[in-house]
């Protein structure tokens, strides 16, 4: 996985952190189907699904990096959808070929095929709830290199935004959704347990900065669940030579190994319930130390004093990320090295969030200065 990240960054000429987010988003989508992260108090663990957010200007190569990281998932989705279309055509032919009175028995004998699509770039909360509750999907990714589709979309602009945010946080925490409707409503009531959602969003600062400083999105804890990266813009430094142009990422062993591993995990047809990947004894020590480290930095006067909603989730996010890494590597336990790497990613993310908090505080300070100046001017005129 580490080599695949380096490979993407090298060929695409994008920052390592951007390539890493793309790969993490892909393997979170794959891992959430089969494993749970360890939880301090819950025997069955918690979802290992991750919420990821990357800022990148137009031309930062974020789309190219994401396309490469998602290659195996897209191929898998395409093959599954082609199979569904074939089965659906056969089913429709059989169903419509029967007399109307035989439709009920036909439905009992052969169920209508379900669209297996599980990766969406743009989907409303109502549509998503419907897919979960009706049993069409259990594992979904909202994945887009145009974050505006989500943050400026219907769900985040509608009157029910707060309800949608509560649903997303419940999905993240418990893998559970519910919908309560009147009997006359076509979109009926229902619940879905053990469902999963990964967010992998990328966008430009002009789009993201409004969302990331939105007091509702921050206050409800929605954004606090995201791992954020705001990489340096490499424009003006991405020079190429003949050697670079002659290389082919499709024949690079680093990518082939990564893509094959993704495909193997996606095609794993083992019929089993999700299982928890536990921490080994050394990893437990790392988990404890990391928790106490971040807790101490939330004290008054410390760097995360005004970032407590985000910092308080650091240990949880590190365990989830380590679970995803461990599953991808085929290990039975989360070891010390894997958890240390996950902790480094979460520290990096917290510092990225801190930068946005500082931008907001600077704006408030400027506003306060303006008010003071106006008051002074008005006072001098009297």
What are the language-model segments listed below?
Residues 1-382:
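Phosphate-handling catalytic cores of nucleic-acid transaction enzymes
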